[in-house]
Each structure stands twice: as C-alpha cells, then as structure tokens.
Amino acid sequence: MGHTHSRQLFVHMLSVMLKHRGITVSKTKLINFLSFIEEVCPWFPREGTVNLETWKKVGEQIRTHYTLHGPEKVPVETLSFWTLIRDCLDFDNDELKRLGNLLKQEEDPLHTPDSVPSYDPPPPPPPSLKMHPSDNDDSLSSTDEAELDEEAAKYHQEDWGFLAQEKGALTSKDELVECFKNLTIALQNAGIQLPSNNNTFPSAPPFPPAYTPTVMAGLDPPPGFPPPSKHMSPLQKALRQAQRLGEVVSDFSLAFPVFENNNQRYYESLPFKQLKELKIACSQYGPTAPFTIAMIESLGTQALPPNDWKQTARACLSGGDYLLWKSEFFEQCARIADVNRQQGIQTSYEMLIGEGPYQATDTQLNFLPGAYAQISNAARQAWKKLPSSSTKTEDLSKVRQGPDEPYQDFVARLLDTIGKIMSDEKAGMVLAKQLAFENANSACQAALRPYRKKGDLSDFIRICADIGPSYMQGIAMAAALQGKSIKEVLFQQQARNKKGLQKSGNSGCFVCGQPGHRAAVCPQKHQTSVNTPNLCPRCKKGKHWARDCRSKTDVQGNPLPPVSGNLGEGPAPGPETMLWGNTAGSKRTIADLCRATRGSAGLDLCATSYTVLTPEMGVQTLATGVFGPLPPGTVGLLLGRSSASLKGILIHPGVIDSDYTGEIKILASAPNKIIVINAGQRIAQLLLVPLVIQGKTINRDRQDKGFGSSDAYWVQNVTEARPELELRINANFFRGVLDTGADISVISDKYWPTTWPKQMAISTLQGIGQTTNPEQSSSLLTWKDKDGHTGQFKPYILPYLPVNLWGRDILSKMGVYLYSPSPTVTDLMLDQGLLPNQGLGKQHQGIILPLDLKPNQDRKGLGCFP
C-alpha cells in the first residue's frame, strides 16, 4: 500500500515539475516510465530524496541496459523523459536566456545605463523530492497526450549540447549576436560610450564535435571545452617548445617551485638531478667548498618555501651539520621577523620558518613575494656559516695524465678538481703547477723537466701541446734505430736548440760526454791520471801547488809575502736579502743563524722557497740553505716550533751530527689539511747540545752524506715462509716474492693494470719453465720501497703466474746482501774493526780477506806479528 502511494506521489511531483517548464505529460506514461526505471534499477529509492547524483546513476543503468539488450527493450520515450527530469534537477547554464536579457537592456540605443548590466542569477533548483503517500490523481486527455509527445520530441533538440547540430537554434543565436554587435556599433556612431566591463558578453567558445548517440540521449555528459592556456613569457614559450622538440633545457633554471598563473599560484617539486648533484658536492668537497656554495647560490634564486629548504638540507647534509644549519636558519629568520615587525611587513617568524599554522606546504604558497626572498637569504646565510668539513676530499694524486691523453685536457681536469677544493687561488696555482709535472706521463715529464722551476702552467701547456700518440711512436722508433733507450732519446731531444744543433751547455758530462750526470759526480773522473804536486816551492811544508798555498810562514818560520793574483770571487754588489739572519744567495753556516729572543734556546730555521704540503704528499724535505759543520763539541737537535704545530705543520725531529757538512734540511708533513709555507717562514729550530763521546768509534767522517739513516739495513731472516716485499710502482702497490735467480722481474697478468701499455718482447724467457715472445712493459716503470730505495725497470708480464717475482734488476738497486755468517767469526772480526763491505785496515784500504799471519822467526817469546 505504501509503495503505491509513493509511486503516485513521485508521478505527481514529476508532473508538477514538467508543467513548471511548460510541458504536459500524462500520468500513464510517467507510471510506465517509472516501472521501467524500477525494472532496470532495483535499488531505486522508494523512500527518501532523489537528487541529481542519483538520477545520473539511473542514466548509467539505462545506458548499460541499452547496450546489452538493444533499442527494442527500451521504450521510445525513456531517453526523453530522463533528459527532461535531469534538466529539472539541474539549472546550471541557460545561455540563450542570459543573451535575451542582455538584448532587452540594449533595445534603446540612446539610453545609457547608469550601471553595468548584470546577468540574472539562475533560478535555484527545486527542492528534493520527498516520498510520502498522496491520494491526488491527475489524468490527461488524448489531446494533451499528443501535445506532450510533440513537446518531448522538441525538448531535447533545444538542449545546449546540440547547438552545433541544430541549424535552427544556431541561426537564432547567430542572429542575436549579430543584432547585439549592430546595436553596439550604432551606439558608438551616436557618440555614446558604453561603460567598460570585463564581464561583457565574451566571444563564443568553439563548438564541440559531433556527439555520440548516448550523449544525444543525455546519458553521457557532453565533452567540455579545453582549459584556458597558461600565461607564459616569450622565453618560457620558447623553452616549452624546445622541450617538446627533444632539446635539453635543464640548464635553464627558470621554473620556480612556486608559480603564478592567472592570479593563482601552484607548486612544483625540485628536480631530482639538482638535489643529486648538491648531495655529491657536499659528500666529496664539503658543504662550504666553493663549488657547493655556488650551487646553493644558484638554488637561492628560486622561490623556495621553508619546507623545501629544510628537506634539501636534511637530504644533503650530515646529521650534525643539519642541526647546526637549522638552528642558524631559525636565528636568521628571527632577526628578519623583528625587522618586518618594525616596518609593518606582514611576514611573521612562523611564516619564515614554516612552523605552526604554516607547517603544511599548501599554506606556504600564499606568502607575499618578498617573503620567499627573505627565506632564501636566511637559508643561504645559515649554510655559509657551517664549519669547514673534515671529511676526506677527492684525492688529488688520482688525477693523473693518461698515456694518450692530451696534456691540456689533463691540466683542465686538475684545475677543475683543485678549484672545487681550495678557495685560495694563489695556493691553488702553486699546487697545480707542482702536480702538473708530478702527475704527468713520462713523455711530458721529460719535456717539462728543464723548465720545471722557471716556467708556469701556460709554458707547460705550450711545451706539451704536440706530445701525443704519434710523438711517442716516433720516439720509440728513434730509440730502436739508434740503439738507445727512450730516456736517452728524450734527453737528446731536449739538448737541441731551435736550429736543430746540439747545445753546448746541456750536452752532458764534460768528462765522459755521456748524458744523465754532471762532471762533479762522473764515475770516470777518478779513473783519469792526475799529476800529484811535489813539495811546495813557497813554504816547503807540504805537497801542494803554490797557487793553493795559504801558509803565512815558511818551514823555518820566516813570514811569507801574500800570494799574487786574483783572489776568490766575492759576493755581487747590492743590498743583502736577510731571512732571519741568513743572507740569501750565499752559503750560510750555523754562525749566520739568529735567535728569536735573548733567552731562546734554539736557532730558528726557515724554508727557502714557497711550498704547498698536502696529506697525500707525506713527509717532504725542505731546504734551509744552512750548511754544517756544527761548532766543535756540539751536536744539533732539529725540533719544531709551537707556532708551526698550531698551524698543522708536523716537523719530524732529527739529530744533526757534529761532523755533518751538508745542507741541513727539515722533514715536514701536513697530515690533516693543505698547508702553505711561504719563503722565509720560521717553522723549525736547531738546539745545540754538548757532544758526549762514549763507546767505540769508527774512524771516518760523515762529511756531506748521510742525511737521514745511512747505516740502516733491511734484514729478513730466511724461514719457511716466502720472502715477500711490497713495492710502489707508479703510484700502485704490488706485493711479490724475492727471486735471486731471476734476471728481470716478472709481474702476473692478473695484477697488471689494464691502462698500462705493454708490447710483445722478441726474446725467450727461461726459468723452471719456458715461454716464447712474452709481453713486456712498453715504458720504464719507477719503483720505490718503504725504505726509500728507488729505480726504474721494464718487467715482463706473464699470464697464469700466481705471484709477482722481484728479480736481480730490483735487488741490486736495493743493495741486498746474501751471506751466512758464523757468529764466532763475526764477533771476532767486529772487535778488530771490521766494516761491512770494506774489510779490515786502518785506512780502509779494502782488505776483505783475513791477513796471512806469519810469526817472526828472529825473536823468541810470545811472538810478534808484522
């Protein structure tokens, strides 16, 4: 019973709604339509309200039923009735009615309205339909039913969505628009100006395309018009077009995270690539490195909200650095907020830091434009106040020139790495010049060696501009044709002048004519016969030349006249350059040194040249220009100064013997950071203490040799384990076994670096096994052990070799001894004054074998040995 009353009430309300729109429908057809709705939609509400959303769901079910069962299962008037009821529930757009109202206001061309005409607001939708019983019934005649069918057929043709297809409706609208334009032109010709209004009737939007049958029936909504285009500058339009064409526009940082378009802001996240590069820069170079600060300055030009700055700092900084940045950022924001409060700017402290009611990112998009500049300034200032990072920077020793890499490309990589680490440009250039020579390949080093001290980076690049693979091939062919090594050919190339003639100044040794050493250290110098002077004719005291006689009296004590001729060459005229008591340009002694104060215990020592120390360089020797010997009866202790230790310079202590006549040098290192030592800077001190002689003394003088350990031997007892030794070969470490039976060292192929060049050797390698044409290194390799022994060799490379073998080409340079001494004989010989590798003898005459002792037969007793 209640169901019947609900249906009658629903039919009655539908009739009232349709009559309100001027359409008369019989109740019989409405009852049949409602029955079909209940059949298709069993869930259709029998009680409660029917709104637009529920009615659209009914339309979806009708469309599904139409698709599955075909048009014969759907009554003809169903789609029309559903469309009529949908429009009764939704009055959102009635364009023709608004246009008609606007046209009525413009009927009198001579009448100027006082105010801008406004559109009539759309009528409110009818109230929701309530389901309650009602006994009222309304019946239609046959004439009314026929009129209803005609009106229903015309109704959906007047729908707004079909203006593009209905010629009559389109013509009516065009006539109205054309009439409106004619009236406007007539008013302008009459001299009457219409008031400007941005809400004047806009130009008609483009009509949508032809609709599908479901859209024409009203089951599907018509497709909307395209959204209005965003306003962009000409440069942004060009970048957007280039991006669509596939061009890379990542270098143009013009897209801020906060944008404005048609007075509406929107947000875009930061590019992941930009955050990744900033994270790598903070990890490798530190947060305060010049390269990292430059990236932060570039990031600060964007309109970043506070949450973006905090997320960027949290992602790129360590935990401690992030807390320091955050506290400094809050402090900077507090200062800015105080200034804003005094000047009446509506940007509070909570807005700047993004806390409180402004914690969400959406609320941070509505700040004043100047607030983003203040936030970026505070974030950048807080970033710059972070402490210098103590993390390990990129190892400069790894920036090495490849065998085929152009020298200018290598210098460019080196300068780029140093520029990212060091902010001091002068110190960076000094370090770059030093590494540009040390990390270059062998060919460039040979070309740069004569100009290492007097050239700069520009000279280095110009000298090595033509050195490449073809140059190395030519050097190798020249060495093969001349029967010389590559080093000798390179030296020969350096010794030629611009005209191709051999230079006279650097042609080699003046004694033997061979390159590679000077005449003072020539091994053949001592083999030449030199006339020994007889008794001096001037003083008659000794055997020396008269020109070298310095005696003031003769053998009888009579005074002698001064020696005629030119005396020794003196210092050049001009002002003297003093470096803490040390006269530059002359050979200084201990007597030339000065103390800092009257009560200073040590004599100050300083470096003579500008030097840069890095942690990768290890211990370096610094020249002081001061030579021995020390005062008689004293010995020197070389110690560091407290001021140098505070700067990070580590001075390694040492002992200077009393009879040492060479140059006193300072052993210094910078284990923690890069240190710059200027010329004349006091970094060490020499403490003189009394010499106490105790124990046995070897009868020889140290002279100018032996700076460092001179009598230290590497001793390794032969055990069941293999005698292994680690060598550093061209900055790489290799461990191998000592092999006294191998003429040339051999490196296993699995340990050989792939970037090192090698060639096929025209020889046969024999040992326990045999191999033909083995591979050999194409260039000379420099090796060095932990004791400072160094040399060059060209090892063989063999596959399937389990270990590396160090042969006699390395062991001979190390000075390795193989002997099996008897403890009793060794102790006896040492007591008699035996010196290793020199033998017995008072004058070190080299008697290695024991003397053949023969007793004196002329005397009796204990005996006398000659």
From Swiss-Prot:
Gag polyprotein: Late-budding domains (L domains) are short sequence motifs essential for viral particle release. They can occur individually or in close proximity within structural proteins. They interacts with sorting cellular proteins of the multivesicular body (MVB) pathway. Most of these proteins are class E vacuolar protein sorting factors belonging to ESCRT-I, ESCRT-II or ESCRT-III complexes. Gag-p12 contains two L domains: a PTAP/PSAP motif which interacts with the UEV domain of TSG101, and a PPXY motif which binds to the WW domains of the ubiquitin ligase NEDD4. GO terms for biological process: nucleotide metabolic process; proteolysis; viral translational frameshifting. Pfam families: dUTPase, G-patch, Gag_p10, Gag_p24, Gag_p24_C, RVP, zf-CCHC, zf-CCHC_5. In the C-terminal section; belongs to the dUTPase family. One of its GO terms (molecular function) is aspartic-type endopeptidase activity. A zinc finger (CCHC-type) spans 507-524. It comes from the Viruses. It is an enzyme of class 3 (hydrolase). The gene is pro. Its EC number is 3.6.1.23, 3.4.23.-. Signal peptide: none annotated. GO terms for cellular component: viral nucleocapsid. The record marks 99-100, 256-257, 477-478, 713-714, 831-832 as: Cleavage. Residues 734-810 form the Peptidase A2 domain. This is Gag-Pro polyprotein. CDD domains: HIV_retropepsin_like, trimeric_dUTPase. A motif (PPXY motif) lies at residues 208-211. Residues 821-866 form the G-patch domain. A motif (PTAP/PSAP motif) lies at residues 202-205, 287-290. Residues 103-148, 550-570 are annotated as: Disordered.
